[in-house]
């Protein structure tokens, strides 16, 4: 049992309490050297145990499951692409209500500015955005299977090389960062900003 596996379980339990990963939805992947630790498919996140975490060997595309019948999250190809292309060490995928609603209300980008919490989001040059900057999160169309999102994800990476998140329309949110701690900070801040934006629209702001 590794600290990384325990980290994934702890985050899954927290995100379940937040109602971001209900009904087996969502997933988390953490990369350490050539091994990606990935939450398994079909397991309720609040019940996930460290020994159930899938260990995926990035070099030879093989994986080991801690229990019979388990397989990696359907998000695995997307996680691996973000690890490889952007150098991320942690990717979090959630199905939060705020994320789904924002993906439906906004067209190609979610944007927000002049909110203090924006300061928690990286700018892409080693610094963070300022509260007066505009946060832009791209939105891509959903697909029948997670792996079918790959072409849109690759195009998003080209169009938004400094992004740390992408919304999938009527589906959810992917967030990534250089460490699990950073990725957790980003996704908590972004979901908070989604909620602020939704309430602002309710108030006609």
UniProtKB/Swiss-Prot annotation:
Per the UniProt record, which residue ranges are transmembrane? none
One molecular function GO term is: zinc ion binding
Q: Where does substrate bind?
A: 75
Catalytic activity reads:
5-(methylsulfanyl)-D-ribulose 1-phosphate = 5-methylsulfanyl-2,3-dioxopentyl phosphate + H2O
Record note on cofactor: Binds 1 zinc ion per subunit.
Q: Name one Pfam family in it.
A: Aldolase_II
- Specify the enzyme's EC class, one word: lyase
**Which protein family is it in?**
Belongs to the aldolase class II family. MtnB subfamily.
Tell me what this protein is called: Methylthioribulose-1-phosphate dehydratase
Q: Which organism is it from?
A: Kluyveromyces lactis (strain ATCC 8585 / CBS 2359 / DSM 70799 / NBRC 1267 / NRRL Y-1140 / WM37) (Yeast)
Lineage, please? Eukaryota, Fungi, Dikarya, Ascomycota, Saccharomycotina
């Amino acid at each position: 049992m590794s600290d990384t596996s325990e980290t994934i379980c702890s985050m899954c339990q927290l995100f379940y309490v937040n109602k971001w990963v209900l009904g087996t939805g969502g997933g988390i992947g953490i990369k350490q050297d050539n091994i990606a630790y990935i939450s398994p498919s079909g397991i309720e996140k609040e019940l996930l145990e460290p020994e159930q975490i899938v260990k995926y060997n990035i070099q030879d595309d093989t994986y080991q499951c801690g229990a019979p019948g388990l397989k990696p999250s359907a998000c695995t190809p997307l996680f691996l692409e973000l690890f490889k292309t952007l150098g991320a060490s942690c990717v979090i995928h959630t199905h939060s209500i705020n994320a789904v609603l924002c993906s439906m209300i906004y067209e190609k980008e979610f944007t927000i500015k002049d909110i203090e919490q924006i300061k928690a989001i990286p700018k892409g040059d080693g610094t963070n955005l300022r509260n007066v900057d505009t946060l832009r999160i791209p939105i891509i169309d959903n697909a029948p299977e997670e792996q079918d999102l790959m072409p849109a994800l690759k195009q998003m990476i080209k169009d938004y090389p400094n992004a740390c998140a992408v919304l999938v329309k009527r589906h959810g949110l992917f967030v990534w960062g250089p460490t699990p701690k950073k990725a957790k900070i980003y996704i908590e801040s972004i979901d908070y900003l989604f909620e602020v934006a939704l309430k602002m629209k309710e108030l006609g702001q």
